[in-house]
Amino acid sequence: MAIATADLFDSHEDILESCETQFRSYGGRAAFHGPIRTVRCHQDNALLKSLLSTPGDGAVLVVDGGGSLRTALVGDLIAGLGVKNGWAGIVVHGAIRDSEAIGGLDIGLKALGSNPRKSTKTGAGEADRPVAFGGCTFTPGHWLYSDADGVVVAPRRLHD
């Protein structure tokens, strides 16, 4: 079910945060929503892969890659793990790769851009802590809604 971020903002402006970052949409789902999980990692995707290997239960993984476009944090295999394990979407404050293949996957995926260079895999980073970028704080357990107009965050679920 698509939920328009503009309509949500009109109805709940007092509690919503709107992310100012202009993401590109890469996944097969143009609109997605779910409870937030987070990972902070810089040019290393081992922790991100580990999280997407667990049941997502319709959650959205917000990845704070520090805005780096130097290496890709998500490729088609990692995005495929998200599909297999029931994640609704991934928002990457960084780069992805395998963009054409990701476009055929049933998952929402937004990122700053793409780069074919793979990341390191040491496991550096931290999970399930608040992360912030684009004037917005992404807190685990809060809700993220995304569509063609952008990304908004609410402290609770806003739809039936």
Swiss-Prot record:
Note accompanying the cofactor annotation: Divalent metal cation.
Enzyme class of the recorded protein, top EC level: lyase
UniProtKB keywords: Lyase, Metal-binding
Subunit structure: Homotrimer.
Stored InterPro entries: RraA, RraA/RraA-like, RraA/RraA-like_sf
EC number of this enzyme: 4.1.3.17, 4.1.1.112
Catalyzed reactions per annotation: 4-hydroxy-4-methyl-2-oxoglutarate = 2 pyruvate; oxaloacetate + H(+) = pyruvate + CO2
Family recorded in the similarity comment: Belongs to the class II aldolase/RraA-like family.
Cofactor(s) required for function per UniProt: a divalent metal cation
Name assigned to this protein: Putative 4-hydroxy-4-methyl-2-oxoglutarate aldolase
Any GO MF annotation of the entry: oxaloacetate decarboxylase activity
UniProt-listed PANTHER family: 4-HYDROXY-4-METHYL-2-OXOGLUTARATE ALDOLASE 3-RELATED
Function: Catalyzes the aldol cleavage of 4-hydroxy-4-methyl-2-oxoglutarate (HMG) into 2 molecules of pyruvate. Also contains a secondary oxaloacetate (OAA) decarboxylase activity due to the common pyruvate enolate transition state formed following C-C bond cleavage in the retro-aldol and decarboxylation reactions.
Binding site for substrate: G75, D76, L77, I78, R97
Family annotation (NCBIfam families): NOT-MenG, PRK09372.1
Binding site for a divalent metal cation: D98
Superkingdom of the organism of origin: Bacteria
Pfam families: RraA-like (PF03737)
One Gene Ontology biological process: regulation of RNA metabolic process
